[in-house]
Amino acid sequence: EKNIKEDLTEIEINPHVDPNITFGVELECSHKLNTSYIALGTLYNNWHFKEEGTVYNGVEITSPILNYTNEDMKRLKCICDFLNENGFKTTKDCGGHIHFGFDYIESITHLQLLYYIYVNTEEILSYMFNKEGTILREGAIANAPFINENILNLYGKYIQTYANNLKSFATLLGNAQKDRYASLNIKNAFSLDKNTIELRIPNGTLEFNELNLNIILFTRIMQKSKYF
């Protein structure tokens, strides 16, 4: 087994991403010695290894809270390198979930615009959030179904709402998606445990470059909807 090595070289990060946006990744994958890694529990600065029951020999690696900084992105790259060098693989059953800090959302209008961008381009985004030349995994139909039909039927193209505060609006959007299994999951918003909005549509990947692109794309949507 190769060790996790801290790569001291600088990596190229997108200068337009707001480093104040927090995020965390859930890397679903498979390994023939999955139980051994799960037994370790934690590796490398609080990255957690736990069982992933939806994947054969499944392991889920969850990150600590990260920011889009050179230091944190180097840590993400080190984990990806370690997994790739030690026999971890993604399968057709793996999803790639990324949580983004909901505290970045400051107003009803900000959330309206984020959903306006997302639900009106959801099908296109489902391709953009996945590696070029790949198709959306079959499991996404059950574990990350599109939300656009439910949201648009309830709130219209411009996501109109009579909610009088951000928390109640987030709750209404969460009710519209029915359960947490949605391409964009807002049910964690305002929870004490995990105040996030979760992107669930990407296929599973252990490729740093793909994760980086997905983080950039969604954080830029969050930023543009704030300053639109």
What are these regions (language model features)?
Residues 1-90, 103-228:
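C-terminal accessory/tail domains of diverse enzymes
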